[in-house]
Amino acid sequence: METKYLKINPADNVVVAISDLKAGEAITVDGHAITLKEDVPAGHKVTLKDFAQGENIIKYGYPIGHAVTAVEQGRWINETQIKTNLAGLLDYTYNPVSVDLNIPKKDLTFKGYRRKNGDVGIRNEVWIIPTVGCVNGIIGQLAEALRRETNCEGVDAIVAFPHNYGCSQLGDDHENTKKILRDMILHPNAGAVLIVSLGCENNQPDVFREFLGDYDTDRVKFMVTQKVGDEFEEGMKILRELYAKAKTDVREDVPLSELRVGLKCGGSDGFSGITANPLLGMFSDFLIAQGGTSVLTEVPEMFGAETILMNRCRTKELFEQTVHLINDFKEYFLSHGEPVGENPSPGNKAGGISTLEDKALGCTQKCGKAYVDGVMGYGDRLKVKGLNLLSAPGNDLVAATALASCGCHMVLFTTGRGTPFGTFVPTMKISTNSTLAKNKPRWIDFNAGVIVENEPMEKTCERFIDYIIRVASGEPVNNEKKNYREIAIFKTGVTL
């Protein structure tokens, strides 16, 4: 029989409607019959008791806010009746928990590209990256011309990645731009890269070249458009040379321990923390047990669930780094006069998410139960395997770009409302509900909605692992098929 509601944690005093519920309908929870006093949309919460004003609403076993007014049992409770408990900066105490994933190691491989420096990519693409937005038009024309000329034969894609920055920036913004562009250029999914500059920008070509550090000079080339006659002719000449080298690369068997994935959610709904996000958590734990790596970001969407992550930090030093990660972002909000709890979007609320704690406790399901083994600043590159936390905002474009930039081969993106967006690595969309998967097959790659339709999570995860391996081995996801590929760089300061 189809389940019509779900109590996520035994301590919860609300349940989530799995399908639309009608006024007068009776549900039985923990042996108690409750008659609904109003219609409740799927994904939204039903009260299991009478709430006094100020009493905490418990979901996922934790408070997600408090009742603004008294609320009766059997009512639909949403953002109009729940207020966040979040405030400003907090002092945290390290209360470490013991983690034992108890997941057997399997001899799994995927077909990847082994680079000269020993790193592995899951795509072999030719990228054109501008140091400044002034040359965006040029790089677009170059990419289109090379695609027409070669039909991408022998490579996975030929892509230009325009952005608006590289000039009129100071301080952290200028450094952030340089870091993200550097990280892209060094990313193993690129078989060859042409860096196109104007010549007079803040992000000076010679300085940026030094900023890159060690790179493969056979596969990374520069063109300064102010220093050449016909930039299109010169650009095509360089690109033909790069393309000829990239297309000689071949896939080989690579252990799954080399795979690095980013964990992302966007357009979340009331099913996110029940289906797709726990699925990612189960996969993340599996991957880490195989020696692989997963990365969680969207720091503002950790607010309200941060202590869960802090207590999973393997060391006191990592705990302290996580405290800084959280409080630095809170200070960023407060310095702009913004409350730290004003996060859920209109789409989130329509889908059943009422407060930031509600969103955060669902969001952090994506990283499973593993120890936290690394904490990174924005623009940093991965140094350790296992579960890493990355500083970046919740914005889909900025966060996904940051995940790819730190070295993730692909971004696993759960969504309940749907989005076509993809960043510069494969951006796999996992739907939280089957309706979205059916309505948006051009966007959605994998449907986790079956988890509330009587398919066991373990079986869904087995299928998901198989699909991940196919994608890592070259099967394109929808954002690649449709060429929905963009980058966005975090900006916090002034524009000159």
Spans of model-derived segments:
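Metallocofactor- and cofactor-centric catalytic cores in central/energy metabolism, strongly enriched
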Residues: 1-410, 417-420, 425-496
